[in-house]
């Protein structure tokens, strides 16, 4: 399923409790998207969230139902960083030089 990074800007600090988390999960399940990970800014007013979703529109539908912003939605891919590290160490040999 495609990956999307969502930037959300909030007027007040984000404080998610267990009930809020359950509501997010329920709506995400109904819409067919999966919240994978989030970063929260130091001032707790901005999040960057990684989602799997069939489309950008599915993310927007869930955001509207949850009454949360989805200011920027960017389709993203991944960079296999660990593969590069493994290749580097393999080329260096067991002594590390």
What are these regions (language model features)?
Residues 30, 53-79:
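An amphipathic, aromatic/His-enriched active-site/gating alpha helix that lines ligand/cofactor pockets
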């Amino acid at each position: 399923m495609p990956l999307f990074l969502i930037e959300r800007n909030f007027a007040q600090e984000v404080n998610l409790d267990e009930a809020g988390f359950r509501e997010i999960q329920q709506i995400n399940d109904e819409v067919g998207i999966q919240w994978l990970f989030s970063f929260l800014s130091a001032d707790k007013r901005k999040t960057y969230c990684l989602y799997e979703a069939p489309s950008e529109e599915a993310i927007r539908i869930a955001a509207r139902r949850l009454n949360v912003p989805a200011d920027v939605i960017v389709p993203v891919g991944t960079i296999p960083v660990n593969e590069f590290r493994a290749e580097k160490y393999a080329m260096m040999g067991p002594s590390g030089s």
